A protein has these predicted regions:
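Soluble periplasmic/extracytoplasmic beta-strand elements of cell-envelope proteins
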Residues: 27-32, 133-139, 146-148
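Select subsegments of transmembrane alpha-helices in polytopic membrane proteins
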Residues: 40-52
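Flexible, solvent-exposed short loops/turns enriched in glycine
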Residues: 126, 141-177
């Protein structure tokens, strides 16, 4: 997480936010987190699957399986083997690839949405003077993004606008264009804000920080 963006890339994202906000009274906050939830159920499920597979293999053995010719019918050894398999599976189930494999798309989408909503309030996007805050939220493990806009700007953009921006951001991240993708989406959010909330009488206070927020 700490090395995902270099200092130069962080500076580029900060500059993109500052440039976009110079044309509007709105506020744009980019944020990235390593994961949006703990997904303990994926670890439990991986352990259960490996334990059941191990149990099936042990039960099916009809010949000795150690140098002392213990058989799978010796329950004590069978229990030890199953427990070890469960522990190993639970450990493997903590890896990002396994979490993605064992967790439904719907569940991951819900978790990312909830984490983004929490961040929206934690970082004060709901407190802008005119209700013009936009959160650009990226969750790395799930490879998903969310764009949440406060009510004033959200009411003025066509349906599907945020979904399009989210799709373009995720596509850019997957194509290893993370900085360019972030900066492009920031600029396009700036265009939307500038269209509906341009600076007024030279007043354009910067209500929220421009830096990329790196969550945990």
């Amino acid at each position: 997480m700490a090395t995902l963006f270099t200092d130069e890339e962080l500076a580029a994202i900060r500059a993109a936010v500052a440039k976009a906000e110079r044309r509007t009274r709105g506020e744009i906050v980019p944020m990235v987190v390593p994961v949006s939830a703990r997904y303990r159920d994926a670890s439990y499920l991986a352990g259960l699957i490996l334990a059941l597979v191990t149990l099936a293999v042990l039960v099916s053995l009809d010949s000795g399986w150690s140098q002392w010719r213990w058989t799978a019918h010796h329950s004590a050894w069978m229990i030890v083997g199953v427990l070890m398999a469960y522990a190993l599976g639970s450990f493997i189930g903590r890896f990002p690839a396994m979490i993605r494999l064992l967790t439904s798309d719907e569940r991951m989408a819900m978790k990312v949405r909830l984490r983004a909503e929490r961040a929206f309030y934690e970082h004060g996007l709901h407190k802008t003077t005119e209700g013009t805050g936009i959160l650009i939220f990226l969750s790395l493990l799930e490879r998903r993004a969310q764009i949440l806009a406060d009510q004033a700007i959200d009411a003025r953009v066509p349906p599907g606008t945020w979904d399009t921006l989210v799709r373009d951001l995720v596509d850019g991240i997957r194509a290893d264009r993370r900085t360019d993708a972030f900066c492009d989406v920031i600029a396009r959010c700036g265009d939307l804000l500038a269209m509906h909330f341009p600076p007024r009488d030279g007043e354009n206070p910067n209500e929220l920080p421009d830096e990329l927020i790196r969550g945990t």
